[in-house]
Amino acid sequence: MEILHIENLNFRYPKAEKDTLHNISLNIWQGDFTVICGATGCGKTTLLKLIKNELAPAGEKSGEILYNGKSIDSLNLRESACAIGFVGQNPDNQIVTDKVWHELSFGLENLGVPQNVIRRRVGEMASYFGIQDWFRKKTDELSGGQKQLLNLASVMVMQPKVLILDEPTSQLDPIAAADFIATLKKLNTEFGITVLLVEHRLEDVFPIADKVLLMENGCVLLYDSPRAVGKNLKKINPEHPMLK
């Protein structure tokens, strides 16, 4: 089942001379684990933020992005929070409270979810992510890996169907990064959540990806299985940096 449909998407930042995204068309299926890659400045982050409407940058946009057949522009805050979750690069930037337990409940409280439901969901996520031992800690006492895991758990407590992540391991050490990526795949497998991941540790994520989206200069260069992308990229450009 198609969960995200992107058709002829173009985007240009204010005062920019050319489009950052040009004629992007994609079909993303429910439960897919998709890795988005490409050189710095190719439009990866812009694409992710346009999918999460509250994070969309200012600029000129044309084309459409549909979630379950419905324009993301028509989703209200509650619908968007329960549909699409976002985790960014900096573990500190998404944390908004001073206690771990409050961070987990904050989004649900803002949506007016009943307290008994909040307690149940927070307890389930704390157990699933192994947060119980530091559940009552202050957030500024956590390591970078713990903070990013908390960010992920705080998003998952909203029960989104799509999870988009913009280089979430970029500030983590190799061990914490590997643990984080393994957790993403576990969520994808056990909950059937659709994952769109921008990640520079390609050797860690290609083996677990269903699809790879390779972008170049704001366009889709290739979109297929990891094996097919590698094979076709060798034909298109044997000297491409991704092949080295």
Q: What residue spans do the PLM features occupy?
A:
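A short, flexible loop at the N-terminus of ABC-type nucleotide-binding domains that lies
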Residues: 1-6, 11-23, 55-58, 76
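Conserved ABC transporter NBD signature motif
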Residues: 60-70
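Conserved ABC ATPase "signature" region
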Residues: 116-134
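Conserved ABC ATPase signature
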Residues: 138-142
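Catalytic Walker B motif of ABC-type/P-loop ATPase nucleotide-binding domains
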Residues: 163-166
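H-loop/switch region of ABC-family ATPase nucleotide-binding domains
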Residues: 199-200
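Conserved beta-strand-loop-alpha-helix hinge in the C-terminal portion
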Residues: 219-243
